[in-house]
Amino acid sequence: MTLTDCDLRRVRVSNGGRHARSGARRLPGARDASTSVWVVSDVLQPLVDLPGVREAADRARDALAEVHMHKANRRGWPTTAAEAAVRAARSSAAIDGGATELPADGRVADPVLAGALRVGQALDGDALRNMVGVWQRAPLQALARLHLLAAADLVADEIELGRPRADAGVAQRLDLLAQTVLTSDAPAPVLAAVVHGELMTLRPFGSADGVVARAASRLVAVSSGLDPHSLGVPEVFWLRRRQAYLDAASGFAAGTADGVGGWVVFCCGALEDGAREARSIADAAG
């Protein structure tokens, strides 16, 4: 799904005796009803109860909270956050096959890297504050903006920028994802993983979807207070383990309990590792 029209799908989980209930909403990650988890009130609560998820989310939260207390981040966080945004953009571009080198003259020729850097600028400083405001009111508008920035050099027709594909089900799944973003009380690392995974699965725009998905995960982290200054760099973890990242995303898309839970734990691990990357930035800043 994405942040607008989603068709949250059921994931049947034998989890502490939970059973399917008539009229239950369906959870993100499952491709069909025979491989899905059943949701009661908060659509994401069953995910929190999957093995290892709650503990992984707690570790991610604690690691990010700790790095925010680093002496370099107490007042100098705008500097460290700016460096984090650049590292995140370069790593996100590389995951999708883009270049990572920043030319000395500042002219970035690679379209994937150029788009990722534009997204990084939108997730830094005053621009981030504005983007978070949009995300909290209208997640789909924020997604459209992210795609416009990420794919500006990738599409032949500008009319495609910010517009989800017209394929059946895309709008519905985006809508359900958006409602989940606005209403779920799930731990922020879990919500970030679901938003990320659903966008990777749906590929709603047909271009730059990976960059958009990872940026949306960052928006969840910032807007929820998990990583309020956007100091973490989980993208480095995903790049270093690119094949494992892609395999975990495929597991999420399959919708099995193991696949969905494995993806969430993997993403929580990336957030925890991203806090270590943030610490290295802060240490270098003094």
Model-derived regions: residue spans:
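FIC/Doc superfamily catalytic core
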Residues: 2-286
